[in-house]
């Protein structure tokens, strides 16, 4: 990462595989082997989306805006002792800590644009959170939506997440668009629900998401690249 006007960029790679598997059967299998906070199956007619996303893009309940940022990943251990050691090593990694704090600050600025600045909080910072196959560093950023802003204003301010684009966000997106040969489609987008009766919203980032179309399954994955990234480590992550 040698470009001076960007701290981080998140390039991704698209994979495809021919399949006769029904997408809903894939969804059922995914629920069993990889349960996640956001499980979804969306039938769009000519394409189907199957997802197991761990990351909240934007959640609004009674005017409280919340972002659940994930940055920093390591595999689960084979034993409880190895699990604990891997989680602690991730938490103490200077590179992962710096990258995580940078993305938390970006999310805080996104939330602050539509919330009362006196209410914006980092409620939790760099929690070690364990999922079925990986360990993540996670943080929660919240704020109270201003009366002159709507839930869609909040969604626009936060989208796309810095964890799948980079920082500064606009410049990182420009860099990624030069590197990736195809448009991302649903990958790194948003899937969720909007409740117009209660004015609530709960939307996740479309990561760990497959698109089924024309008997082909498409999967896309990316990773944050910073100045001191090790290529092999980032690819494995």
Question: Model regions: which residues?
Answer:
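Extended alpha-helical targeting/anchoring segments
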Residues: 1, 5-237
């Amino acid at each position: 990462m040698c470009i001076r006007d960007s701290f981080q960029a998140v390039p991704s790679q698209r994979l495809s595989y021919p399949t006769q598997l029904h997408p809903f059967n894939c969804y059922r299998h995914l629920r069993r082997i990889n349960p996640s906070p956001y499980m979804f199956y969306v039938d769009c007619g000519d394409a189907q989306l199957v997802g197991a996303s761990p990351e909240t893009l934007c959640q609004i309940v009674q005017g409280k805006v919340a972002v659940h940022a994930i940055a920093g990943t390591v595999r689960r251990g084979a034993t409880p002792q190895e699990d604990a050691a891997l989680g602690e090593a991730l938490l103490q990694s200077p590179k992962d800590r710096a990258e995580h704090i940078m993305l938390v600050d970006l999310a805080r600025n996104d939330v602050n644009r539509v919330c009362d600045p006196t209410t914006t909080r980092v409620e939790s910072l760099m929690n070690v959170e364990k999922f079925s196959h990986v360990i993540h560093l996670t943080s929660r950023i919240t704020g109270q939506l201003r009366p002159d802003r709507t839930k869609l204003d909040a969604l626009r301010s936060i989208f796309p997440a810095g964890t799948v684009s980079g920082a500064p966000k606009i410049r990182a997106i420009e860099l990624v668009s030069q590197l990736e040969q195809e448009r991302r489609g649903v990958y790194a987008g948003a899937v969720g629900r909007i409740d117009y009766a209660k004015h609530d919203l709960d939307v996740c980032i479309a990561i760990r998401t497959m698109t089924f179309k024309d008997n082909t399954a498409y999967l896309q994955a990316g990773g944050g690249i910073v100045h001191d990234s090790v290529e092999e480590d980032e690819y494995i992550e």
